[in-house]
Amino acid sequence: MEFARFGRLTVSAGSPGLDDDVRRPTGDAGRMSDFAMSEAEFRALRERLRRASAWVPADRRGALNNITMSDVVAAAGDVRVGRTVSLAAPIQGPAADNPDPAVHQMAHSAEGPERASGLSFATDRLALNIHGDADSHMDALCHVLFDGTLYNGVADDTATATGAAELSIDVVSQGIAGRGLLLDIPRVRGMPWLEPGDHVTADDLLAAESAQADRISQGDLVFVRVGHRARRRSVGPWDAAGARAGLHPAALELLAQRRIGVLGSDSNNDTAPSAVEGVDFPVHVLAINAMGLHLLDYLEFEDLVALCEELRRWSFLCVLAPLRLPAGTGSPINPIAIF
């Protein structure tokens, strides 16, 4: 299959981490004209992915069906040194990319009037907008409504004002474990991060495979680094809702072919502005609505990158444990990579 349809892709000999026969976008490839996809092309792609990812009509697990018990056992067998690293960012305060921040309040503390001799407790409470542009979270399969349906043809009116009757985050109440694979796109391109508006193509994913001597396999928990957090630390917060790097919609075809289990990014997974005229969040539509693929948004990969570089390996056992929130459309998440 030809994956170079979107973006001017050229051989770049001598680029860090690239073989001469691996193509990557040239420096001007972030321009919208290079990557623009019509709505008709997008809808045709959505239908292909929907058909390719179909399970039985009653299925509610989606791409999680690609992760077998044998896959989990094999991933556990890859633990060699016993080191762990979090893939979540600290919960964020108010900023340009976080206009509706989490509210963390102390309910009881040593400063309160209830303080006395003997036993007392420090307690707190947390209120969080799960689907923002700052905090690490997992999207449930009920999160994306498109053309009147959720994943696998479930009617969108099952997502009610009181919660989701179908496809809620409770689908993953028993957790997810498997082989995690980090694909570090800035490393392959020889830059610290991708600029907002840049697109990760299927060719970028293939180049990362080659550079890291690893391959996206069935059931993998695939993590695509664009360097969002690194850029945020360097230049400061910006309105990520309007401008961010992410996957190009066409790259989902490769991930569907490989039958991955989960997809995550240190950004939103979707590029902004959208590459598809008239369709916002096209990657969310394709991944969640068409493929039944749980997404992890706004993760933190910088500690993970350092450990991967130190150990010279980019795969690991990964464990995801979302909150047990019946009828929830998502959950805060703290993925743990184990090496």
What are the functions of these language-model segments?
Residues 1-15:
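Extreme N-terminal basic, low-complexity initiation segments
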Residues 3, 27-339:
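Active-/binding-site microenvironments in catalytic and ligand-binding cores
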Residues 14-17, 40:
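Serine/proline-rich low-complexity intrinsically disordered segments, especially terminal tails, linkers
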Residues 17-31:
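Short, Lys/Arg-enriched N-terminal segments with co-localized hydrophobic residues
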